Each structure stands twice: as C-alpha cells, then as structure tokens.
C-alpha cells in the first residue's frame, strides 16, 4: 500500500482506577452533549452562502492506520503545514497556546523544550532521565528530548496525542505522543517553494523545498531551513562580552526519496541534518529587569543531529500489509553555560563531549482497513548509547559559607557507557459489533535494560577542564593496587594535595518488564457524531542516578568496586543507583462531531488519570551519613480534566477556532525535601515542621507543575476580497492561562523572610495571563507569491516559562517566554 499523505494525528491512552462519581458525572455530561449534538445535526440546512464551505477532512495515523481525525477515537490535535504556518510554528514550543493541555518550558543548559501534556512531563533533560511525552518523526522514536528541538519544516502533518499511549507507542508515552510526518516525495509532478522571514531581534529565516520526480516510480525531495536571531537577554553592566543568551542559530536540511515500482511495494528513505548553535536560555534574577542578567560566561552551544529514517511497505494480494520502520540517530553536543548570573560568584558548566547514538527496528503486520475485524501485531527494538563528559567550574567560595573556601573547584561527570536496550511486542484489534458499535483491545509487553559502565562523578581541588584526566603515577600504588582509578583518589578522605577524587561510582545494570493495555468502545451516535470510552495504561521506564561511595580507609581494590556495584543494584536495601518505572491508568470519555453541514466541528474529552510510583526527588542518607537529594518512587497523583476543541466556518469568509482545557492535577502522596531552596524554603511551605515527618516536607494536595487549572485559546480570521481579485486575511489569536506552578512546593506569594528579599513574591508561580498574536496576509489574484506581516505577544507581556533556581543561591529567578516579536514573511511557490 502506498504511503498515505497525512495531515494531523491523534492520541489517547489512560490508566488505572476511576472514581464512580466522576464516571457518572462524565457520562451524564457526554449524554447531554450527544443529545444536543444530535439535535443540531438535524437542523435545517444553512443558507446557500455557507453550503459551499466545509471543514477540510484531515487524516491522521494515531491508531497506526490512516483515519480521519473525526473518526479517530483518541484525544488528538492535528496540523498540516499550512496550519503550522498560520500559527508561526517553526519549533515544537511554538505550539503552546494552540493545543489543549500542552505547556512547554525551556531548559537553559540543554537548550531543550520540556513538554508537558495534561500536567505530565519531565524537567530532567540529561541522559539519565526520560521524557514523559514521546517524540516520533516518521514513526522513529527519539529517546532524548533534545530531538524535539529540531526545526518543524516541510511537513505533511503534526499530531499531538494526549494521554498515555502505552500499547501502540510503548515506553515513555505516559503523558502523550508528538508525531511529526515529513512531506514525502511526490511521483506525479514537480514542485518547489521558498519562504523568507525578516523580523526584530535581527530575525532572518529561510525555508525552501524542491520535489523532483525522476521516473514514474522514483522521486526525490530536498528541503532546508535556517533560522537566526539575536538574543533577548541583555548583558548587565560589567558582563563579559559575547553573544546574548536567548539567541537562535538553527539550520536543518533533509533529503528524501520514494521508490514505488508497483502498487504492492513502496520504500521511503530520508536523511536529515540538524545544527543548533544558539546560546541557550538563561534565567534572570527577580527584582531587576526581566530581560537582563549579569553574565561572566557567554553562552556557547554546538549541537549536531544526524538522522536516517526508512519505511518499507509490502501489500499482499489478500489485504495483509507488512511494514518495516527503521531509524538511526547520532548526535553530539559541546556547550558552555553561565550558572551563577552574579558578579560576585563565578560558575559555569557544560558539555565537553556529550554524544548520543540510537537505533530502532520495528516490524509491523496488519490486515486491510475495511475488514470487520481489524488486527495489527508488531515487534519493536530500540537501543541507545550515551557517552558524556560534563564539567562544572564552581565558585571559589561556598554560596552559604560566605568567605569559606570551596574545596571542590571543579567537578566532572564522566559516563563513558550509559545506555538502554528495549524490546517489545504488541497487538491491537478492532471489531465491528454492528454498523455503529466497535470495540478495540490491545496489549504490549516491554522489556527494558539499562546500564552504566564506568560512570564516575569526580571532584577536583583546582580547575582542570580537560577531556582526559592525566595519569599521575604518584597516586597509583598502595591506595590503588589494581589500577582502577587512573591516578584518582578513591574518596575525598584519602586525597593527596592537588589530587582529584571519585565522589560516586555509578556502575549499575537494572532491568524491568511491563505489560500495558487498552480497551475501547466506539459508538456512531449519528452519521456525523461519534462517542467513545477508553481505558488505557502507561509505563515510563526507570532511570539511572548517581551511585554509591567508597567509605574505606585502605587500598581500593576490585572487591571494593564489586561491593559498590552490588549496592547500586540492590533495590531491596534502598541503595540502588536507579529509580523504578512509574505507571499510570486512565479512563476517557470522548465526543467527536461535525454539525451544520460540516461547518462546525466539535471535539471533547473527559478523563481521569491516576499515577503510581511517581518518580520524584526525596531525601536519603548515604552510607557516609550525608543527606542527599535522590530520585525515588514515593508519590501518587490524580489528574482529572476536560478538553474541548472547536472550529466554525463563520459565514462565507470567516473562521473561528477555539480550545479549552480544565485540569485538576494534584499530588495524592508526595513526601520530599525542598529541592529548590533547601533551608531557605522551609518558611514558605505550610507543611514544614510536621513532627511526624522530620527532615521531610509533605506536598500532598499540592498542584502538579506546568498544569494550569484553566487554559484556553480563541482565534478568528476573515478573508476580504479586494476589487482587483486579491485577498487580504487578518488573523487574531488570544490565549489565556490561569496560574501555573513551577515547583511542587507551591509557595506562591510568600516573600516575608525569604532572605529579606521583598521581590520574592510568586517565587514559583506565574499568575494568570492573556497573550495576543496578530497577522495580516495578502494573496494576489494571480501569481505564485504571498506576503504576511505578523506580531506575536502583541502587548509584550512578561510571561514566566519556568523557575530557574540553581546552586543553593536563595534568589528566585525565572526562564521567560519570548517577548514581543514581529516581522514580515514572503512565500513563493513553483509548479
């Protein structure tokens, strides 16, 4: 079967238990909505002026079959390339405000979007953590969140699936899935286009594409994009000179080919190169300017991703299709990032060598879409390897100790071989009970293996930022008879003058397995209205963290290393260097309808999701008696919500789009330390001081981060035809969000006593805000070009994106969304 052209995608898959009262309320609401929908669908036909208009049919692959978005029984938002252009989407974080329950924050040092769907995401962007929203391009999974920073250009469609997707998409999709489908070569005709954008902050962007049929069976497509702009964070007086933080310097190119020798077989192959040389994002300290910071170390980033993706389909005469989806990704990063933003303290860190390699193989077998019993089975294999050298140069005095010298002037985190191997099998089927009822069942079994071989956290008394620690023969001998440490001291207590030592030994090799599943019932209430209910489970893989220490006073031998590794793998003893997986269960009720002769489209979803073994950070005591913050499975959370999407073709020339999201997302159980402010944060948490919880805080009942209770958007565009036949199209979009929390502590407006800083109000919260975007497009009556002027964040609203607190510095600071940006864009096409 030939590769189908896609437009958007869909999603869905929740997990665990649901409260009866919530189900009853949800069912009643959906029944009422369905009754109203049926009444609307039987109203008299609209006037002839609107009869000629209809909402475009969009196809998605959220079920790994091609279906229309209205017929897809999942909560999914989909865009084609034109819709992405209208919303000025070039990167994933540009989608914020257009998708229900989607919120995106920026991570400074990694220059990586942190994606949250329905209140679920991850702020850990390192090789030790996994995202909770899976990212796929042409069916190939990206394990590292950095892959989501790639440019979104020349696409057939972008699909955002909300809710756990544990059956068809597997691991690390507890929050949802983002599917990108690149534009495939077209065998039928030549086409080309180009786009040029100029804007403030010296914005210069170009995108271009050429599609070339070489024969009746072979076509190639070449696409490229470049996007550059100056930074948005000004250097405070006295800062080091260099590129401003917040600058953009992105480039990408893609070559793809499609070979279809007959109606039974097609082969798609693409190679993509992505380069990011922007400076990354940096927090600014509250009490000063939102857009300035004192910089001692200008940002530097050199991030390169090379990706190879392929898909082969063969259609047998009996209607069965076998598909192979393969992918290979190789990425490397070097970076430098200022970590202090303070003229009195000097600290920076970054990747000296951070390399990542991933391979995917997937084999899929399914029958034809028209069968009464549709079935699909598949096998999935994924492997990734990470090699990391990450250095931090610390200040010469302790933050909390005033003039106390800091003995750890330099630390380096060496993970020469940290990786993952995942194998899974899955099956899903849909049976047509009657002409209007369908039932679907699915299962997936996953085995995950992780490892860290030779990982070490190393501390040094003076700055030695080198890629390889030199061997010092003076330190090899009595303390290291087996030559395991290459001249390092085995711990801080045995260090000699000028010698570096191993702080933690991170070797570990945990493994897990999990079966996830789904069940769904669909009902075609009328020819244009579908109702569905679903139950689904999700699974997020366990993660590796820092391991144990050597506490001995004698020679460090292989037996000592073996004992540490045994402790790192001993979950029962509480000394493991890993965190077990988290799981969720979701129940969802949905409505998808088309009304008023397909000029009004309404989608709605009611859901509840319960999390167990939520991966959180807690306080533990090491074997040396020191208190450390470590990840652990110590939490539960429940998320109840409602999402609505609507599109209405108003009259003969207008279009109204809207989204609405309500989230009741709270921690049910969450005992932890204050991971952001330590002792300084105690005064701001009402749960502190509980005698039953010494050294712990109880965040149970607090709101999840990046999960506003209410968020909505509304956009309207109108087409005006001029006397010369040209078209002018103004467009206005408003997006609203209620308050957003950035820390589980939910401190909010508690400035008193916070190091006597009166501007510490809302230290972990963004108040409710409204953001406006506008554009005006011109299309001539004849010709192959168009012109558009646009402005985003029209009122230049200062909107916090995340809390950017680091290194025990008790001054609150924040990441920010983009300030007001504006520009013009010209598009030219050729056929």
Model-derived segments and spans:
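Short acidic/polar hinge/loop motifs at secondary-structure boundaries
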Residues: 126, 133, 138-164
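Solvent-exposed loop segments that connect transmembrane elements
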Residues: 232-246, 279-296, 338-351, 391-415, ...
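Membrane-embedded beta-barrel scaffold of Gram-negative outer-membrane proteins
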Residues: 311-339, 527-536, 546-547, 557-633, ...
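C-terminal beta-signal and adjacent terminal beta-strands/loops
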Residues: 4, 733-752, 777-831
